[in-house]
Amino acid sequence: MSPFLQTATDTGWNLSHTYTTLPGVFFAAAKPMVASKPQLVIFNHALAQDLGLALGQASEQELAELFGGKALPPGAQPIAQAYAGHQFGHFTMLGDGRAVLLGEQVTPAGQRFDLQFKGSGQTPFSRRGDGKAALAPMLREYIISEAMFALGIPTTRSLAVVATGEPVYRENVLPGAMLTRVAASHIRVGTFEYAASIGADNRALSAVEGQGGRSPLEALADYTIARHYPEIGPRADRYVAFFDAVAERQARLIARWQCVGFIHGVMNTDNMALAGETIDYGPCAFMDAFNPATVFSSIDQHGRYAFGNQPRIAAWNLARFAETLLSLFADDEQQAIAIGQQALARFNERFNHHYSLGMQAKLGLVNHEEADVGLVTDLLTLMQQHAADYTNTFRRLSGSAAESAENYGTKGNALPGTDALFAAAEFTAWAGRWWARVKQQNISPAEALANMRAVNPAVIPRNHKVEEALAAAVSAGDLSVMGSLLKALKNPFVETEANLAYRSPAPETGEPYRTFCGT
């Protein structure tokens, strides 16, 4: 590798390793594989700058070797993290089976971010897997995670994708790739499930490892509080406050998902990050026609993780998290359970609050009235009845110059997937109620519509457009389609001639769209 890339002072590498101060049961040393023929597919220069990395002068080959495992960044100490998880409701021991954590990049502003290779070969937690990843799922994560970032939704980021030049054997032989993921951390609900499963009272182990007699669970909780919730401090009820803080971030996150029509697809407890970021973009997708029962994942045959179920599943996951903390809530088990139940109930209140605020903002409403809940519910019911496109319905409302219910349906800018709804008599009646409510506010209707355009995206990563980009990149080696898509997704709230092609739902084919985990 070029000496330029190996010099920390020249390139901004500032890797730290606070996670390895935890008991050794939480990780294992792991060496990433070296790509035999690394080729840079895409590199996120803007994110690199945000991380304090000065890699603008590096050649594509140098970047390919760096993010293809040929030579690790200076200061890297790769590990695989141990964790467990409830997958589709069933508990299992897991761990990073195809990923390694290189370290924590500390930015010039003092922020700390995990840098992780994904698809980097076998680790001590691989079980029977090969630890590899195919190119299409890695590019898919890059596209969707960067789209979520542009939408303002907390998310992990993607720094680079490198083609390894090696085959990956799944149902078919696929080209392999490695993704470099950036995250606030990779601590999950499943990490705490793992800690609880190995014994909350295993203090002897922690004492040997310099944890001051704390159990691994206690050490993990203290570490996570210090890293992500330092405002909690050393208060007596710090672990209850910790749960509340995690639940608050999850309530905000899931509410944001619901407001943009995002369907994660595999909300297992190992895919709930305690930093409050969206993580693991396997079978995720965005909804076209509104239907709460929408499922895209090929493995979710019973709709456990359907769009409308996501808030309930988040609460279920948090209940599993609360169970891991019971011994820290109180010494008395019944008291601890009561504390956990009360804390969990607060999540539902928080989610409903943030979701209501988000949906009211989508309708240009700046102050809450009880009747607004019915206004939102009635619109969603009509959207489902008329198979209205979720994104385009709200965008069409945002672009309206309506002044009365009578002419409303003809005033909005026509957008694909909305005509049947806007032509319906029931919608005209609803629109009259909504417009009257908008005009009651202490801001002008024009201001309300401008506010709506700032929260209702014109462009989302439409599933068929993502598939087009992946097919061109993987089958033909043509990255221009993905480049155009990423450019459109970078400014999702702006309507331009260039992004017009990205604002239509997929053509009707009669076949439901299906996503796959990619593992």
What are these language model-derived features?
Residues V266-M267, M272:
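Hydrophobic HxD+1 residue recognition
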Residues K37-L40, H45-L63, G68-P234, L274-E277, ...:
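Conserved ATP-binding subdomain of kinase catalytic cores across diverse folds
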Residues G12, T21, F26-F27, K37-Q39, ...:
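Residue-level detector of functional hotspots within protein domains
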Residues K31-M33, D130-K132, V240-A241:
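Short, contiguous strand/loop micro-motifs
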Residues M138, P167-H264, A275-T381:
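ATP-dependent phospho-/nucleotidyl transfer catalytic cores
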Residues M1-Y83, F88, F296, Q301-T519:
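Regulatory N- and C-terminal appendages and interdomain linkers associated
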